[in-house]
């Protein structure tokens, strides 16, 4: 315990703070230089989506601005951008994929790529590359720094269909701290 991570939208010049609890009389914290300190507020100079990782045990933090989250189709290397909706959730609804054929269309594997002020990372399944199990945990995500077309931990579309092309999807990618980091891909 004592560690916290959040993805959130912040507005330039608008004060924000972190609190130790959502109930009772929480301790308030702000950022000063490279440290987490009690009381006060912090601001960002640019409106954007930010990730903050805070270690209250040692009073330290890291941050990055998240500029884009994409669904990444492995074989075709197609990137489909997901707009940020709020509360650590990126979502694209009623999106029809077109223009794929052959192997570009037929391979069911995918993952997510995140672009940020610290570079590009991938979000993939916690377990090794395998077909869906029907268990919610199959869709839990972890961030990886090795960004390549073929890696372990790709996710497989479920149900498997005859390609991605000419189908409509709802795609949700959630890094909301209240739940496991997960995603959902619905074929309509």
Region spans (language model):
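Insoluble glucan recognition modules
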Residues: 1-188
């Amino acid at each position: 315990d004592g560690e916290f991570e959040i993805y959130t939208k912040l507005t330039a010049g608008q004060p924000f703070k972190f609190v130790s609890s959502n109930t009772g009389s929480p301790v308030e914290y702000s950022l000063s230089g490279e440290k987490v300190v009690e009381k006060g507020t912090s601001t960002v100079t640019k409106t954007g989506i930010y990730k903050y990782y805070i270690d209250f045990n040692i009073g330290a933090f890291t941050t990055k601005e998240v500029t884009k989250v994409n669904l990444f189709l492995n074989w075709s290397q197609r990137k489909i951008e997901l707009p940020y909706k709020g509360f650590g959730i990126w979502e694209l609804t009623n999106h029809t994929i077109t223009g794929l054929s052959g192997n570009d269309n037929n391979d069911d594997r995918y993952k997510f790529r995140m672009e940020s002020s610290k570079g590009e990372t991938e979000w993939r399944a916690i377990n090794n590359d395998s077909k869906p199990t029907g268990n919610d945990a199959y869709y839990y995500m972890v961030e990886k720094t090795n960004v390549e077309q073929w890696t372990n931990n790709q996710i497989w579309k479920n149900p498997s269909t005859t390609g991605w092309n000419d189908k409509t999807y709802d795609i949700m990618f959630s890094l909301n701290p209240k739940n496991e980091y997960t995603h959902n891909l619905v074929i309509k």
